């Protein structure tokens, strides 16, 4: 789940959380005439599945086509979206999906699990299984903030459409249709936890390909798994690392900094994030570590000064990081991240 502000996240969800295509020097889109996804070729038989905006897909996925089967990273935000990916993937390969990896428990990455039948192994960290099995992916302030608010978002869009000029109204009506379909799809979700769990590491050997699943420590959640292809030098990170500031509402901020340090020794050139464009190199690790340290320092100072979470969320200022994150044009952060920081500071979350 990506971060910064609730408004930006809601707009991203309404628009299908669609990321731009990777630069031509990195990859090129495959002509598949799909509606929900662009499959961006990263290397031979490795694709970044990026939403087109025609559906609310929630997150990016990764597709690894092996000798006899396919591994998909993350099942997306609803069974409708998972079905769309499965069907549209047939334009890339006739091989069956055999494995789905849940990078973490958040609804936008794991609520398509029910689409995959008994012939598909869903793999995740033991924390991820526990969270989904207990119903945590469908409750709490994170889910309430982004899914629970959908009816209100739809009502607001309809009000805007009614008062808008014809050209703008047409665009709004299209967004309304996408968001209403997404809301209906969320009502059909029956969370299915991973059928195979891991603690620290698991390796799959599929033909000549080595696929490493790694838990390097707590970060965005308590069970973030990255998928590493050492031969191809590709790393799928879920929401552990991306090109933009991530969502902190279920995070372990200080652990996250340490976990990111564990990424640095890995051999990879290309990162496939759960949100945003694919990118090259490791520089963004340092950028995100600096942001997290600054956020934590300011949150602790606000807490120790007796500032309430909502006021602190308005006052925390991360604009010094705008050189790496241009969207940081004003002070203020998502209040869920501050609430989470206060819980960690007070020992309510361990």
Segments (PLM) and residue ranges:
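Active-site neighborhood of phospho(di)ester-bond hydrolases with catalytic His/Asp-centered motifs
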Residues: 73-75, 98-106, 123-126, 216, ...
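C-terminal regulatory/interaction regions
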Residues: 2, 304-350
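Conserved beta-strand hairpin/beta-sheet module of binuclear metal-dependent hydrolase folds
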Residues: 40-90, 225-239
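Active-site-proximal loop/helix segments of hydrolase catalytic cores
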Residues: 210-266
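Active-site HxH/HxHxD metal-binding segment of metal-dependent hydrolases
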Residues: 81, 87-194, 203, 297
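Core dinuclear metal-dependent hydrolase active-site scaffold
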Residues: 41, 173, 187-229
């Amino acid at each position: 789940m990506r971060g910064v502000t609730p408004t930006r996240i809601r707009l991203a969800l309404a628009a299908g959380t669609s990321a731009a295509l990777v630069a031509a020097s990195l990859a090129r889109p495959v002509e598949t005439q799909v509606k929900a996804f662009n499959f961006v070729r990263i290397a031979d038989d490795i694709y970044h599945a990026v939403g087109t905006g025609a559906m609310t897909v929630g997150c990016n996925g990764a597709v690894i086509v092996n000798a006899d089967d396919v591994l998909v990273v993350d099942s997306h935000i609803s069974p409708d979206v998972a079905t769309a990916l499965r069907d549209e993937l047939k334009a890339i390969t006739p091989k069956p999906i055999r494995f789905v990896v849940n990078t973490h428990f958040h609804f936008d990455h794991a609520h398509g699990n029910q689409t995959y039948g008994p012939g598909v192994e869903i793999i995740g960290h033991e924390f991820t299984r526990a969270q989904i099995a207990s119903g945590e992916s469908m409750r709490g302030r994170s889910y309430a903030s982004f899914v629970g608010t959908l009816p209100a978002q739809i009502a607001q869009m309809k009000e805007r459409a009614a008062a808008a000029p014809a050209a703008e109204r047409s665009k709004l009506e299209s967004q309304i249709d996408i968001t209403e379909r997404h809301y209906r799809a969320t009502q059909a979700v029956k969370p299915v936890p991973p059928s195979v769990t891991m603690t620290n590491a698991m390796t799959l050997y599929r033909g000549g390909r080595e696929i490493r699943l790694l838990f390097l420590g707590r970060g965005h959640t308590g069970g973030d798994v990255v998928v590493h292809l050492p031969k191809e030098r590709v790393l799928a990170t879920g929401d552990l690392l991306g090109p933009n500031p991530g969502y902190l509402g279920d995070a372990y901020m200080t652990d996250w900094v340490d976990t990111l340090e564990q990424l640095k020794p890995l051999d990879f050139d290309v990162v496939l994030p759960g949100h945003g464009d694919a990118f090259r190199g490791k520089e963004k690790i340092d950028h995100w570590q600096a942001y997290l340290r600054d956020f934590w320092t300011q949150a602790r100072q606000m807490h120790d000064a007796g500032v309430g979470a909502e006021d602190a969320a308005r006052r925390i200022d991360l604009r010094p990081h705008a050189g790496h994150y241009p969207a940081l044009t004003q002070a203020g952060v998502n209040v869920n991240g501050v609430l989470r920081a206060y819980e960690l500071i007070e020992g309510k979350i361990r």
